[in-house]
Each structure stands twice: as C-alpha cells, then as structure tokens.
Design a protein with these regions (language model features):
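A hydrophobic membrane-anchoring alpha-helix module
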Residues: 168-209
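Residues within membrane-spanning alpha-helices of integral membrane proteins
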Residues: 27-34, 106-109, 113, 179, ...
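N-terminal helical submodule of small eukaryotic multi-pass membrane proteins
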Residues: 2-107
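Short, flexible/disordered secondary-structure transition segments
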Residues: 37, 43, 50-53, 128-132, ...
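Cytoplasm-facing ends of alpha-helical transmembrane segments in multi-pass membrane proteins
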Residues: 38-45, 71-91, 109-124, 154-160, ...
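Intrinsically disordered cytoplasmic terminal tails of membrane proteins
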Residues: 1-14, 92-95, 143, 149, ...
Length: 220
C-alpha cells in the first residue's frame, strides 16, 4: 500500500494569523480609547469651556499633568499603530521576533495607561481646584480633598458639589464625570494591554512548536 501522509496537528501559519488578528483588534480598541482619553483630558483643562482658567493656572493638578494626552493618548496610539501594522510574517523565527517586539510595545502601553488611570483616580479622590470661601476671604485651593479628620465623602455627598466651590461653576460635577471617564478608559486600556502581553508571549512560546508539531508519514 502507498505511504499515507499524516496531517499536521496544528499549523504555525494558523497561529500567526490568529495572533495577528488579535493584535489588530486590540489596536483598534486602543485607538478608540485613546481618543476618549484625549478628549476627556482636554475638557478637564477647560472648566466651563473657558481657557482663562488654564492660562491663570486655576486647573486641577492631576488634569494639568495631561496624562490623558501623552500617557493614555500619544504613547498608547504609538503602540496601537504597531499592533495595527502587524502582518503575516513567514517563518516561525521571524514570527517570534515580531511577537517579542509586540510584547515590549504592550508592556510600554500597559505602564502608560495604568499610570494615567492612577492619576485619574487620585484626581477624583482629591477633588477639584476651585475658588471657595475661607475665614479670611475667597481663595483658590482644593477644599474637598481628604484630611485627617475628614474622609473623601464628597463623592457620596452631592450637597457639597454645588455648595463649596464658587468658581469654576459646576467644576465638581465636571471633574467627577471626566475623571471617571478618563480613569475608566485608561483602565480598559491597561486590561487590553495586559491581555495583549499574554497573547504575544503565547505567540513567542508556541510559535516554533506549532510549526514543528507534525505527524510523520506512516508507511504501510
């Protein structure tokens, strides 16, 4: 009887295609979330949609750090661009090298988005910079920040949202909504990047073995 050739248990090309497809999906999601972070941070810099607060330095510290622009914005977009440009690479060795680069990009995006998320949570807990009444008159400060004798209860006490800050108008609601959006979007970025690290490392580990795992021809 003629020799019967066995079918490969799994194909390296199939693995490459699957990993590359996941990379492109993550890239699209990261670009979308980076756009959300950028818009949210720009709005945080413009209370009441007026630029004079920014020019006078009367903007919440965590918003002025602009992590939504450069950390969860520009840096993540650079990484996402690399994911979107991922192509089918012939040869398992070349594929594993590409996956190592993508893993490094994923780690960088993970760190930058996690940093933005941490800054956003801090800004949310600390409260906004605003003009408020003191015993010596009106002054700029952060009246809602937690102190030794007071916790961060302003988030759960809406009566403080309109009764403490005089300017910018509605700045408490403004910051709560936008910092929540910024923190949530950057947190999702961090989760996607963490999953992408696992995805690319699996590609590195399994890339070669998937190509070598074949059934030898069996002679009758």
């Amino acid at each position: 009887m003629p020799a019967q050739k066995g079918r490969p248990a799994c194909h390296c090309s199939d693995l490459r295609m699957c990993v590359s497809r996941c990379l492109r999906c993550v890239g699209v999601a990261l670009v979308t979330l980076a756009t959300v972070c950028t818009v949210a941070n720009i709005l945080l810099l413009l209370p009441e949609l007026k630029v004079h607060f920014l020019l006078e330095g009367h903007v919440t510290r965590e918003a002025s750090w602009a992590t939504g622009l450069w950390s969860s914005g520009l840096l993540v977009v650079i990484g996402a661009r690399a994911f979107l440009q991922s192509r089918h690479t012939p040869g398992c060795c070349a594929f594993r090298t590409q996956m190592l680069r993508q893993a490094l990009y994923s780690c960088a995006c993970l760190l930058s988005s996690a940093f933005c998320c941490l800054v956003s949570i801090t800004g949310l807990v600390q409260g906004p910079l605003c003009l408020y009444n003191t015993t010596s008159g009106s002054a700029w400060g952060v009246p809602l920040q937690p102190t030794a004798d007071r916790d961060a209860g302003y988030l759960y006490n809406r009566s403080l949202w309109s009764g403490v800050c005089l300017e910018p108008k509605g700045v408490v609601q403004w910051n709560v909504v936008l910092f929540s959006i910024l923190g949530g979007a950057s947190g999702l970025q961090a989760l996607l990047c963490a999953a992408n690290v696992i995805n690319t490392l699996l590609g590195v580990v399994l890339g070669r073995s998937a190509g070598d795992n074949k059934v030898s021809p069996v002679s009758a």
